[in-house]
């Protein structure tokens, strides 16, 4: 499983999936996994990454998403135009802090449905949390849990 996004949600998702027996890799644009996680919790989370052998790819700006992985550039060195790939995964989980819909693109007010675009390249798309609609955290967490059990 490749988890795209190594913030709090992505890191915890990776931990959960690894705990369930999946081989997991996480790709993150920033230079560390879980920089937004509370320090004390991050210690335990990174111990879990070590325990389960979760691969960490950092400083990686994803440029394309495929059904089996992603291509990316070096986010730490803007002069490096090399395109790298992380491919061969059976599942790609997006946890990029990205709304599935937004209303501003290239200076224009538009409605863009990212989930619909993904349906052309992957067999399943599950939109969860506030990307569906704003609501109580408990409801969104339950919804994400139900989807994670299906993976």
Across the structure, where does each feature detected by a protein language model lie?
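A conserved FAD-binding loop/helix module that cradles the flavin
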Residues: 6-16, 32-41, 102-104, 110-113, ...
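Hydrophobic Val/Ile/Leu positions in short beta-strands of Rossmann-like dinucleotide-binding domains
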Residues: 3-4, 26
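A Rossmann-like FAD-binding core segment of flavoenzymes
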Residues: 11, 18-114
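C-terminal non-catalytic scaffold/interaction domains in large multidomain proteins
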Residues: 1-3, 85-86
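A glycine-rich phosphate-binding loop feature that marks nucleotide/adenosyl-phosphate handling sites
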Residues: 1, 7, 63-65
């Amino acid at each position: 499983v490749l988890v795209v996004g190594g913030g709090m949600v992505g890191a915890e998702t990776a931990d959960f999936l690894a705990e369930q027996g999946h081989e997991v890799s996480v790709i993150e644009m920033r230079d560390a996994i879980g920089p937004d996680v509370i320090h004390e919790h991050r210690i335990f989370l990174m111990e879990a990454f070590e325990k389960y052998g979760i691969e960490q790819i950092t400083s990686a700006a994803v440029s394309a998403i495929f059904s089996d992985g992603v291509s990316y550039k070096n986010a730490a060195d803007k002069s490096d135009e090399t395109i790298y790939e992380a491919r061969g995964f059976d599942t790609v989980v997006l946890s990029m802090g990205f709304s599935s819909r937004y209303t501003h693109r290239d200076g224009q007010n538009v409605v863009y449905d990212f989930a619909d675009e993904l349906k052309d390249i992957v067999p399943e798309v599950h939109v969860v949390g506030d990307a569906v609609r704003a609501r109580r955290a408990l409801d969104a967490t339950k919804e994400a849990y139900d989807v994670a059990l299906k993976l």
